[in-house]
């Protein structure tokens, strides 16, 4: 299971070679090491950021690809490397195209460990805890309210998807050795709508300001595919409200364990 990568989109715009070296180059080294040691199965953490923007923001695994940042391009490149390697060897490979993970383990055994994460919910939590402003980056996208649209997938559902995918690897054949799956809820939620859900969950309004998109940002997308349900027997069970609740509930536990 290959989840390792640098993931900060604006940073990838500023430091593309670092991202290509780390995310692509290190993956090639991993695949060579696997081949030397007789390991022929891999589950890769890809990203829905590789999709081209659709007018309705709905995507399936067959939708057009057009990564909008060096980070997204690294995921795009690794997918093609895995496809080619699988067709040229005994490798069986699956790519899970994550949408936007949020939340923590509902039983609070683990959660976000970075003190100041760069993703949207992490920034909301920082603003909520510090009584500072939360910036909606980009409010002129062609969405229903101008803010970016996302498919917020709870990390617990994401973990369940990995278990289902690993079990599915046993069924992968040499005729179809590389497969991809969208891992999302199927519901598009705008950033402004997430702000509203956050305020409802905490009972406290955020001080919201509007700003331009970050370098590498895109309008967004959400999955309308049933492929994961049909082939993996998986579908999302938790909501963005669950993700907000669990992310906040994790904070005192993180403080006990990590001191921040």
Regions found by a protein language model. Give the residues of each.
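Catalytic helix-loop patch of NAD(P)-dependent Rossmann-fold dehydrogenases
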Residues: 17, 21-32, 36, 40-41, ...
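C-terminal substrate-binding subdomain of Rossmann-fold SDR/epimerase-dehydratase oxidoreductases
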Residues: 128-260
